[in-house]
């Protein structure tokens, strides 16, 4: 192959040759990732450690070796001398005096300089020998060694001339190999180093694989399941390894030892789905097979952001005309400052969505792939597949061929755009996620579903009781004074009967004459006890009873042919009750559910004390009393009582007054809501996706407004949400409204706030976005018994399981027979012969977003256990088998530190030299000097909410996002108040934008004699820039001038960090600073111009975090292999990693994790030109050693479906959380096996 797959590393051998012998290095010159940063530091003088007089004297704190603790000139405690010399070598550049002075002034300005610091004990640790001449070469050599066998296998596929497809496919169970002429030969497994592979599953029959096709450089292969070839009445739904596809070990053969596994590569499109159906992947000890996903490589090369994906689909369907906006639209966009109009569409031609058909069209071209046969696997039965076997095998083979063609084009591109070998090695390791489970998984599913159904029944009964109680308001028309039920259908259906036929009177016969002494029913004579009846009296009574029954039977002819449905009941109630002829008939309003519009009314829901109301046009909102302008609209002489159904506004006023009295104040004060689930900063936090969605909604809404203005020039827009004169707004309440087109006498209508903005309607107040509002009391069930509040509480409790149970219950669990379990499990005292031991392979897309973050719908988004959420103990059901433990840790403030170190390297080349960096390293929550506390104090919000805004800014969100979020967190804020708070926050953190004029701009200022104020560096403010642009445009007949040469943020705690992020995002080819990965071609400036800045700034931090993870995975694999630690990678959830480790190796694995974190952080510092690392971020605050997967080892995970907790119900005790000092004590600071204490 003409292209070298890996670029050569200076001073290191590359390829299959021997890896250089490990050894220490002495760092001399350290390459900087940014030439300007490196130049600035090389120009700084090398000065002595003692700095200017402003620096306070440090206490003489001794290290464990008896020396002084190491500090940098800004009083940040650094690595111990021993660790520093092992990693960075001796010596190194010291920051210049000017840089230190500039940093001190900056920290003084933000009130951080001179804050006391708590010293940490030094960590003295002998690291394993490192390879190469520096950290970068160390990681390069490790990654090359780990990925080289797979890269060689990939090379075989790249250079191969594939054999032709066989003319017919063998109808035979198991694997079949096809020769050059198409001859079919049964084989146990495909003995190949590299395969392109595709599995198809008949979904109607469950998750068992149905058929598969593979191709190697030399032959085609097909596989058929026993369930396809052999017809049976039924098959078991429980999967075992025998149902899966063998790729490494023939059926019936024993598993090889760890050393005997061969390195093999499988390539596929969304290959994690195919991996889930491979037998050997479920073994506890794992194999050496690795997987390359063409879908993930596409995302890294030419993937789309979520907003771009929407635009791409719209353009593909012809719903969006690809043309630049009008001048009027551009002007309005600039004026609104909500984000640019989409003016560059070049990216449409170099990107696509993720489907194989579209990816093939992008990279290969040619006729489109035929995808219609796929529907048979989705909707058809096994019989349909048997009848169309040859066609479906050809379809599967076509996908394999297309995947190979895509792979041939992608891999060279991927290696060019992600040149560091750590990226590929990390993705290969990410592709073998593994979650061990046992019989407790089945118990969890049953308990959660049972609890859910029980609560559902209780909620149904509560709702039915509410409906029955509401029906009683018909008496005396009391419903007319009910703030919720007044506008329901209260019309009654009268009881109808046919007219009686006229019959000719017959003369009374003896038998029809009244019997003497027999009274009518109910006659007092009947009640009198006359003693025992005579035989004659008994006979007479029997005759009379038969006559009455005969008469009653005759009235059936008067009933209508179609029986009436609940006559005498109001219309809304009748709709909730099934008809008598319904096969599923049950008594009462059993059709009632939370999805019905009548339910919030029956529950008497209030929003801040105002009753909820539904509008066909605006969705759910609430009624605010006090409006008087529409009371006069009634016809003259008509009273409210005679006007028909009229809103009981006086009752609503009384309701709100009562609410205010209960609150103990006349008017409600602002109160912060809890966090919606997608904004909780837990391991499933989706904030990095929400930022882009919310930020671009502003762009979309503004574009729609411009289209409306352009459609009718000079014509005012139609009535908006706040249409109407100002005096029709309440003075004591503000919110999303009033919407005066909802004309309800005596009341204003306000919409419930929607997370996507005021223009969106709320379809249900029971949506999960309103759960925090239920918890903080904003959304409440009204008075009148406990049924309403209880139903609301139950809705909150079952929300998680209702939304997730299908995904959870459909997880593919494979139970292992005893013969497939390792000896460490079988011989452990806790092994249960009757128990079940198996695994789930989470179908992780290793690079599922443009930031190359992994994506998976269940496990990577699972929330932590909550006491009021059924089934939320999900993650704790991942439980290590006997003899094994789960070892892992969370990277502390990963993205904050990455952003901070980028800013520090850019500003003065010292850790903690910016306010943002200092707060990340030295800030203390107890003193209010950490980042989140500072933001909370500045804006006057809670610390939890401040976290969201801080992460949002780092992910590229602008001020509109902050305004939206402020109003979502505190819906009682006005738009103006939210804008002021957001402006205050961004001015204090991000700073203000300043501009440096271009040569053309300077010439215009001189020629036009325009007065502008400049800072010391020649920067001008936004106001002066607008003045220059306005005057030059006016005096040159609106000619466009390029007056800006450079933009920069100034004056905020995070200004330098944002300047660095934006400089990377706007560079010609943005690359991550550490591993040098390119941004997607669909977001390169040459394709998008100035568009999609949110996504691009977000990419810098998030993609660097992925670099961090890949470095960790490579380092952990090295240490596990080097020191024979028996363990395997399990899963990475955002900034958390977990490994499955033999019990006896757990402490060595914990030490390996700590060393991995140290080397990874040092790699970041080294690549940014910083020859040191602060002690506070060098090690994990704690490494968790546990038997199950949970956020904290002390969490008992009590939930409604697990009320007694993990220890009592499942027998899982609390785990261990060990810091670096405890781990060193347990392991004696060594990774060698002899250092490991007993279990």
UniProtKB/Swiss-Prot annotation:
Changing residue 232 to H: In LS; displays markedly increased exonuclease activity and reduced polymerization activity; produces ligatable 5'-ends. DNA binds at residues 306, 593, 806, 849, 1094-1095. One of its GO terms (cellular component) is mitochondrial matrix. A motif (Pol C) lies at residues 1134-1141. Mg(2+) 2 binds at residues 890-891, 1135. It catalyses: DNA(n) + a 2'-deoxyribonucleoside 5'-triphosphate = DNA(n+1) + diphosphate; a 3'-end 2'-deoxyribonucleotidyl-deoxyribonucleotide-DNA + H2O = a 3'-end 2'-deoxyribonucleotide-DNA + a 2'-deoxyribonucleoside 5'-phosphate + H(+); a 5'-end 2'-deoxyribose-2'-deoxyribonucleotide-DNA = (2E,4S)-4-hydroxypenten-2-al-5-phosphate + a 5'-end 5'-phospho-2'-deoxyribonucleoside-DNA + H(+). This is DNA polymerase subunit gamma-1. It comes from Homo sapiens (Human). The gene is POLG.
């Amino acid at each position: 192959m003409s292209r070298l797959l890996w670029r050569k590393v200076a001073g290191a051998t590359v390829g299959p040759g021997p890896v250089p012998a490990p050894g220490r290095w002495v760092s001399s010159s350290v390459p900087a990732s940014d030439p300007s940063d490196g130049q600035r530091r090389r120009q700084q003088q090398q000065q002595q450690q003692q700095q200017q007089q402003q620096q306070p004297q440090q206490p003489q704190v001794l290290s464990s070796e008896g020396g002084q603790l190491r500090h940098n000139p800004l009083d940040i405690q650094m690595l111990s001398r021993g660790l520093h010399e092992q990693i960075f070598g001796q010596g190194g550049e010291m920051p210049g005096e000017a840089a230190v002075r500039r940093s001190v002034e900056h920290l003084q300005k933000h009130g951080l300089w001179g804050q006391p610091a708590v010293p940490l004990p030094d960590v003295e640790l002998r690291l394993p020998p490192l390879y190469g001449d520096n950290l970068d070469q160390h990681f390069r050599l490790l990654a090359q060694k780990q990925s080289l066998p797979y890269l060689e296998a990939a090379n075989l596929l790249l250079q191969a001339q594939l054999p032709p497809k066989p003319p017919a496919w063998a109808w035979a169970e198991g694997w079949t190999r096809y020769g050059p002429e198409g001859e079919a030969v049964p084989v146990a497994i495909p003995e190949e180093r590299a395969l392109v592979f595709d599995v198809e599953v008949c979904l109607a029959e469950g998750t068992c694989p149905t058929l598969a096709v593979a191709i190697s450089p030399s032959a085609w292969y097909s596989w058929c399941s026993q369930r396809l070839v052999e017809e049976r009445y039924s098959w078991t739904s429980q999967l075992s390894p025998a149902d899966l596809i063998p790729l490494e070990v023939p059926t019936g053969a024993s598993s090889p030892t760890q050393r005997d596994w061969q390195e093999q590569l499988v390539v596929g499109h969304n290959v994690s789905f195919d991996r889930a159906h491979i037998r050997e992947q479920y073994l506890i000890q794992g194999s050496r097979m690795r997987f390359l996903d063409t879908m993930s490589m596409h995302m890294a090369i030419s993937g789309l952001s979520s907003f771009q994906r929407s635009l791409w689909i719209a353009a593909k369907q012809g719903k969006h005309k690809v043309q630049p906006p009008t001048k009027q639209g551009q002007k309005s966009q600039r004026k609104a400052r909500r984000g640019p109009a989409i003016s560059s569409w070049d990216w449409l031609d170099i990107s696509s969505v993720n489907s194989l058909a579209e990816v093939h069209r992008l990279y290969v071209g040619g006729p489109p792939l035929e995808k219609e046969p796929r529907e048979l696997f989705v909707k058809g039965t096994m019989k349909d597949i048997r009848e169309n076997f040859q066609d479906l095998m050809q379809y599967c083979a076509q996908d394999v061929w297309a995947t190979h063609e895509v792979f041939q084009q992608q891999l060279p591109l991927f290696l060019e755009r992600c040149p560091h070998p750590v990226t590929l090695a990390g993705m290969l390791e990410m592709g073998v996620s593994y979650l061990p489970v046992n019989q407790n998984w089945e118990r969890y599913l049953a308990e959660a579903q049972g609890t859910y159904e029980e609560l559902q029944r209780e909620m149904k009964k509560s709702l039915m009781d509410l409906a029955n109680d509401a029906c009683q308001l018909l008496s005396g028309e009391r419903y007319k004074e009910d703030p919720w039920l007044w506008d329901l259908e209260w019309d009654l259906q009268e009881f109808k009967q046919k007219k009686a036929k006229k019959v000719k009177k017959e003369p009374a016969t003896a038998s029809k004459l009244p019997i003497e002494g027999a009274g009518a029913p109910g006659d007092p004579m009947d009640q009198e006890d006359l003693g025992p009846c005579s035989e004659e009296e008994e006979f007479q009574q029997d005759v009379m009873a038969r006559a009455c029954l005969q008469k009653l039977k005759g009235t059936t002819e008067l009933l209508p042919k179609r029986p009436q449905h609940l006559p005498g009941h109001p219309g809304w109630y009748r709709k909730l009750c099934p008809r008598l002829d319904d096969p599923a008939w049950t008594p009462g309003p059993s059709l009632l559910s939370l999805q019905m519009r009548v339910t919030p009314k029956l529950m008497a829901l209030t929003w801040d004390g105002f009753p909820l109301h539904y509008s066909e046009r605006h969705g759910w909102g609430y009624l605010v009393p006090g409006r008087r302008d529409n009371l006069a609209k009634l016809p003259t002489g008509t009273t409210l009582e005679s006007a028909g159904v009229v809103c009981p506004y006086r009752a609503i006023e009384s309701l709100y007054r009562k609410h205010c009295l209960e609150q103990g104040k006349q008017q409600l004060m602002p109160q912060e809501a809890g966090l919606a689930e997608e904004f909780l900063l837990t391991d499933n936090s989706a904030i990095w996706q929400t930022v882009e969605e919310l930020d671009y909604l502003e762009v979309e809404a503004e574009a729609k407004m411009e289209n409306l203005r352009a459609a009718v020039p000079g014509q005012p827009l139609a009535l908006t949400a706040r249409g109407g004169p100002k005096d029709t707004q309440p003075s004591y309440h503000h919110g999303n409204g009033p919407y005066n087109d909802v004309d309800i006498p005596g009341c204003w209508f306000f919409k419930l706030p929607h997370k996507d903005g005021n223009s969106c309607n709320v379809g249900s107040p029971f949506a999960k976005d309103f759960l925090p509002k239920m918890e903080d009391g904003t959304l409440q069930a009204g008075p009148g018994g406990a049924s309403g509040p209880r139903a609301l509480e139950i809705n909150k409790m079952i929300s998680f399981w209702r939304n997730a149970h299908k995904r959870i219950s459909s997880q593919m669990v494979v139970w292992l027979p005893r013969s497939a379990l390792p000896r460490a499990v079988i011989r452990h005292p806790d092994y249960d012969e009757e128990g079940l031991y198996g695994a789930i392979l989470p179908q992780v897309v290793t690079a599922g977003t443009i930031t190359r973050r992994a994506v998976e719908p269940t496990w990577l988004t699972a929330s932590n256990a909550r006491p009021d959420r059924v089934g939320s103990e999900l993650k704790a059901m991942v439980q290590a088998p006997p003899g094994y433990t789960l070892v892992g840790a969370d990277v502390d403030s990963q993205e904050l530190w990455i952003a901070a170190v980028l800013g520090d390297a850019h500003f003065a080349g010292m850790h903690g030299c910016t306010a943002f960096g200092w707060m990340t390293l030295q800030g203390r929550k107890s003193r209010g000097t950490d980042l989140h506390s500072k933001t909370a104090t500045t804006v006057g919000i809670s610390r939890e909410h401040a976290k969201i805004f801080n992460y949002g800014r780092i992910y590229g969100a602008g001020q509109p996002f902050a305004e939206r979020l402020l109003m979502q967190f505190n819906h009682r804020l006005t738009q103006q108040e939210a804008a002021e708070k957001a402006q205050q926050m961004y001015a204090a953190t991000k700073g203000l934008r300043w501009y440096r004029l271009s040569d053309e701009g300077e010439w215009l200022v001189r020629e036009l004699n325009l007065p502008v104020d400049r800072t010391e560096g020649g920067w001008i403010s936004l106001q002066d820039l607008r003045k220059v642009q306005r005057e030059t445009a006016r005096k040159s007949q609106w000619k466009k001038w390029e007056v800006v040469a450079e933009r920069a943020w100034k004056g905020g705690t995070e200004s330098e960090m944002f300047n660095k992020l934006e400089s990377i995002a706007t560079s010609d080819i943005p690359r991550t600073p550490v591993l040098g990965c390119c941004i997607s071609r669909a977001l390169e400036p040459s394709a998008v111009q100035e568009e999609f800045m949110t996504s691009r700034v977000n990419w810098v931090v998030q993609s660097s975090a992925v670099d961090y993870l890949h470095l960790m995975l490579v380092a952990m694999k090295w240490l596990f292999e080097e020191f024979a630690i028996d363990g395997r990678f399990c899963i990475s959830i955002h900034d958390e990693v977990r490994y499955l480790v033999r019990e006896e190796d757990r402490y060595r694995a914990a030490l390996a994790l700590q060393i991995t974190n140290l080397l990874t952080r040092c790699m970041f510092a080294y690549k940014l030109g910083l020859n040191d690392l602060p002690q506070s971020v060098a090690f994990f605050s704690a490494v968790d050693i546990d038997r199950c997967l949970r956020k904290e080892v002390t969490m008992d995970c009590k939930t409604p479906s697990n009320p007694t907790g993990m220890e009592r119900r499942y027998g899982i005790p609390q785990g261990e959380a060990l810091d670096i000092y405890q781990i060193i004590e347990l392991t004696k600071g060594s990774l060698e096996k002899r250092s490991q204490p007993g279990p």
